[in-house]
Amino acid sequence: MKSYSQLLKDNNTLGKSYKQQSPDTLSAFMQLHKAAMAPGELDLKTKEMIALGIAIAARCDGCIAAHVFAALKAGSTQAELVEVIDVAVLMGGGPSLTYGIQALGAIEEFAAESQ
């Protein structure tokens, strides 16, 4: 079984390397991320749950790790995130079920680490 905590750490490390090699692109993406996730009509918790659902449907392990971690940090409960998985499965079918189950593993891993 993969460690989502380790995946998140690895992506952060590789992101630093990418920033050195392509600073303009990463900077522009981070500005977009900051703007999209800024509180507005939707709070950060809600936006992270939306991002997690999309990450599951898009089958992106690194995105799942990042958005599970961020959603829990923003105050999402495990029960709320399971409902996010449910909606992602509805929209993405069998492949989303497979990645939704992986997301549940990430939820359980990060929740256990925070206790």
PLM region spans:
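A ubiquitous short alpha-helical element
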Residues: 13-21, 51-55, 72
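Immediate flanking context of iron-sulfur cluster ligation sites
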Residues: 41-58, 82-84
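Charged/polar positions on well-ordered alpha helices
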Residues: 55, 69, 73, 90, ...
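C-terminal structural segments of small proteins and small subunits
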Residues: 82-108
